[in-house]
Amino acid sequence: MLDLEVVPERSLGNEQWEFTLGMPLAQAVAILQKHCRIIRNVQVLYSEQSPLSHDLILNLTQDGITLLFDAFNQRLKVIEVCELTKVKLKYCGVHFNSQAIAPTIEQIDQSFGATHPGVYNSTEQLFHLNFRGLSFSFQLDSWTEAPKYEPNFAHGLASLQIPHGATVKRMYIYSGNSLQDTKAPVMPLSCFLGNVYAESVDVLRDGTGPSGLRLRLLAAGCGPGVLADAKMRVFERAVYFGDSCQDVLSMLGSPHKVFYKSEDKMKIHSPSPHKQVPSKCNDYFFNYFTLGVDILFDANTHKVKKFVLHTNYPGHYNFNIYHRCEFKIPLAIKKENAGGQTEICTTYSKWDSIQELLGHPVEKPVVLHRSSSPNNTNPFGSTFCFGLQRMIFEVMQNNHIASVTLYGPPRPGAHLRTAELP
């Protein structure tokens, strides 16, 4: 049985690990994977057809804990303990829930002190006792007690008193004063772990198509040798097609991984693929997992030739490998009445809406089958790749975009950076 410390408006954990509000989904999954012998039977719950309409949930069934992640930013929004009999809980080092201590209203008062009157929910038949960043739900013993706690009974004053001996049915940890209005907080500094994250990624374009990326980056910076002076650092960097490997390293730092392509599976769709001379060396990717970006370099020139932006939707083969890339892509509208107008494609745009703006592709999509080995099948099914305006949109079966690949001819010279402008 897990023995965990409750920190209102912040976290639930122990000396080995901690689920912290604002934590990225990937970090929570990494904790579960590392401690898989202790924390077992974890379920991932999401809406397959409408992944943005419901929270993404990690359900720790063995331990009675549910982690709710915001569907958009994929950061931890609410920590719910839904079965208190499966876990030990303490506050400031003192247990208020264990096999020997029942979490009664008297025990909660003793451990957490006074707060506002409890609020009765007649639909759930539960009392909610709210502290800042922490709520307890109490179950009424019988239906006969319910009417006197209705708001219109005794001018609402009866709801000031939760019945003696009532025990906690659920506990919630969240940010702010209201569970209903809570949002996932910004990522805590403790979750950066030396990584750089992208707050937003803007696709730059010229008259012919995409030309590069402008990234707004977040990092945890420290004062001179004092950890307590740690604070969020925000800065911008730009990388372009034709930039050298050294240019990218100086802008974004070292990648999490370098991946060398063994073969080009899309080469068969290029004109006269059989006439292409086999290369003696392979193109390679810089994988920036916390940015949600891959950068492909030409094996001969070591210049940028492609960018890949990942949306990290559940139900995709690469889910949870990349942090979600919050991109914005300007699209050139070619309709007669558009008059050179541009529209913005984002991480949350659906393929149908993009097709309405750009027109349907001339060619049929390329069907992409992913699997870990030739003998394995992908349980999430195939995706479809459409090419438009020097971009390849990988589309899932629910009409959401899984990734966008930007490509273009390498530029002959290094791109003039903003900092170098007169």
UniProtKB/Swiss-Prot annotation:
It comes from Mus musculus (Mouse). It holds the Pfam family PHAF1. It is found in: Cytoplasm; Preautophagosomal structure. GO terms for cellular component: phagophore assembly site. Interacts with BCAS3; the interaction is requrired for the association with the phagophore. This is Phagosome assembly factor 1. Plays a regulatory role in autophagic activity. In complex with BCAS3, associates with the autophagosome formation site during both non-selective and selective autophagy. Belongs to the PHAF1 family. The keyword Cytoplasm applies. PANTHER family: PHAGOSOME ASSEMBLY FACTOR 1, UPF0183 PROTEIN. The gene is Phaf1. It comes from the Eukaryota. Keywords: Cytoplasm. Coiled coil: none annotated.
